[in-house]
């Protein structure tokens, strides 16, 4: 049995890089240090329905037929070239080189390229563009933070090692006693497992986050809040939370989809960032979005470097345009604008609204995914890639914007191509057809 040390876990945005993977006869038989979700990521592909070769069918009611990569990519390229407005969506579980090639493919085919941020942390990116990004690395939080604030976030379930590795429990350079040296504030409508560990739980009413942030900012600036409670939180608790934040040596605010998908969307995050800026008049305070997929941040970084825009980039006029609400994947699907779609390293069929999925079922759909998913079931073509972070190396961006190299621990099935190799084939075929 071979033990691979310091392997990066390709599941969530925490990108834990201390995993040990146990390999026997080119099969993963176990892991060490990984959380339950990370362990399942390394182990589940053994039991999941995995596509061994590309599949094709003309009619979605027919059965799939096995073909080779050459045939499948040629048909995909033909569909791309003939489409009036193709959509290339996903990318959050692919490595950065494949993402960069995907943006190039979208440019060549005058497509819309979008990633899963448009249905999760898209509002965060809009807010950052509006008012700034007072961010730090997770290492700084671990070593310096004595106040940690989780807003609309439940890392105990969503990012299980976040609190133990970076934010609350670890012993840092200036926080030698770990949790004893830190105070923890949680803002959540429910008494989550994370909230149960908090020193202060601000149990905000659903969709009242904007009011609560505004009250925190007012209290921080010395205004007298006349109401007995704001957004369901007692005024005295608001003042207590603000005092803790003001007196911190280093404060760190982590926010997740509880905020981005609350009523007000990016305007709430605008306000939260302004609260962090206000706090910097008294102490050092930073914020970090709790990104979900392990490389959702990577696509936003790559797309911004290449096109100037983080997601929902429309190349239909030959140059990049960006207008979330018009050019994002859900918008074009629900309006019925797109006439061909490629789903890459994500599962739109499982997570998009019914109206969007109904349109996906009507149009030619290509799925680039190693396993059977609700998206692949309604596809015309399935192009299975090798699994990044397990069978292929590459680069991914952690939630705080730190790039980390993913490792290869086992060999991919014979003849299986990586996401980047599939993209290269598609670009070559498109160039030949144009």
UniProtKB/Swiss-Prot annotation:
Top-rank taxon, per record: Archaea
Gene Ontology terms, MF aspect: formylmethanofuran dehydrogenase activity; NADH dehydrogenase activity
Involved pathway(s): One-carbon metabolism; methanogenesis from CO(2); 5,10-methenyl-5,6,7,8-tetrahydromethanopterin from CO(2): step 1/3
InterPro entries: Formylmethanofuran_DH_bsu, Mopterin_OxRdtase, Prok_molybdopt-oxidoreductase
Any one cellular-component term (Gene Ontology): membrane
Keyword Oxidoreductase in record: yes
Enzyme Commission identifier(s): 1.2.7.12
GO BP term, example: methanogenesis, from carbon dioxide
Cofactors demanded by this protein: W-bis(molybdopterin guanine dinucleotide)
Entry keywords, A to Z: Methanogenesis, Oxidoreductase, Selenocysteine, Tungsten
UniProt KW DNA-binding keyword: no
Catalytic activity from the UniProt record: N-formylmethanofuran + 2 oxidized [2Fe-2S]-[ferredoxin] + H2O = methanofuran + 2 reduced [2Fe-2S]-[ferredoxin] + CO2 + H(+)
Similarity comment: family membership: Belongs to the FwdB family.
Role summary: Catalyzes the reversible oxidation of CO(2) and methanofuran (MFR) to N-formylmethanofuran (CHO-MFR). This enzyme is oxygen-labile.
NCBIfam families named in the record: one_C_dehyd_B
Quaternary structure and partners: This enzyme is composed of six subunits FwdA, FwdC, FwdD, FwdE, FwdF and FwdG.
Protein name: Tungsten-containing formylmethanofuran dehydrogenase 2 subunit B
Taxonomic source organism: Methanococcus maripaludis (strain DSM 14266 / JCM 13030 / NBRC 101832 / S2 / LL)
Gene (name only): fwdB
